[in-house]
């Protein structure tokens, strides 16, 4: 069990399963997963042993609510979002890398120097709402974002920035996110960059990826790298030359699979990636260029748009990595119609995935594996490889 004083003192209970042994956590998650898939026939599927995570220091990202005063800022959580007195400082949270604590200390000093008054949601006063810190495990570089109510403190921030960079030379990306609403909303629409670099370079399994502000990226790098590597291994067994990556984000799944397939079969691989975020598409396209993948087309579209495009060359493999709501009945039925040989489904919500698999009536599961992306909680990631059923 992790030695966490915040949990022991009942200050933070985000890790609801902290007192449950790691082996039991995995057993319960595996049982839960099988219950969600009980309505589909997985008897012939290969159940791969769960991919385990480190139990502490595994997070590459910290989301810190800023409270307290400008002279004594508190970085952590508010147990009651409307009560600044309920603030808990989580700078020594054991889920973060140990060196984050020293970084937070430097940032507290910066808050005072730049006059960034912590926002008080009850009084609707103040400027600084959150500090968001992300680290690349490949480069050890950092992305730092200040979520502010207004631009009023921007001149002071710019004035103090050189001193901050002296103390934290690994800062690669620094930005201001403006969130003017008087509500406990994490971030707003506008991002102001204070550095030339706007993406944080990362690398999993030799695949360059780019973390962007306001974009989704897994917070457990070790398990995320394992998830992508597993996807690579599973699909490389088959002669796949045309794949779609729906909900592709910055291209993690599609790029891993395309690279592995090209190396295995020695032929150009056609990859089409669909993602609603234009900045994610820019990042994915940049990664593909670095890898030298030529037959790649990343498009900023809603994943549902593929249903309307009937003229696309039919894929051999479709990768889906949807948000918690799943892919839904309409997209499931579309996949039944176009019948790719394989579907690779990655999910953070086994319940909605189970419903989707019921709709994918033309497919049977070949392989299933749980990934312990979120230790100390009931949450997990799951990867399923589906094969088109043979018609008798």
Swiss-Prot record:
It holds the Pfam family tRNA_U5-meth_tr. It catalyses: uridine(747) in 23S rRNA + S-adenosyl-L-methionine = 5-methyluridine(747) in 23S rRNA + S-adenosyl-L-homocysteine + H(+). One of its GO terms (molecular function) is iron ion binding. CDD domains: AdoMet_MTases (cd02440). [4Fe-4S] cluster binds at residues 4, 12, 15, 93. Keywords: 4Fe-4S, Iron, Iron-sulfur, Metal-binding, Methyltransferase, rRNA processing, S-adenosyl-L-methionine, Transferase. Signal peptide: none annotated. S-adenosyl-L-methionine binds at residues 218, 247, 275, 321. The active site is at 348 (nucleophile). GO terms for biological process: rRNA base methylation. Its EC number is 2.1.1.189. Catalyzes the formation of 5-methyl-uridine at position 747 (m5U747) in 23S rRNA. Belongs to the class I-like SAM-binding methyltransferase superfamily. RNA M5U methyltransferase family. RlmC subfamily. This is 23S rRNA (uracil(747)-C(5))-methyltransferase RlmC. The lineage of its organism: Bacteria, Pseudomonadati, Pseudomonadota, Gammaproteobacteria, Pasteurellales.
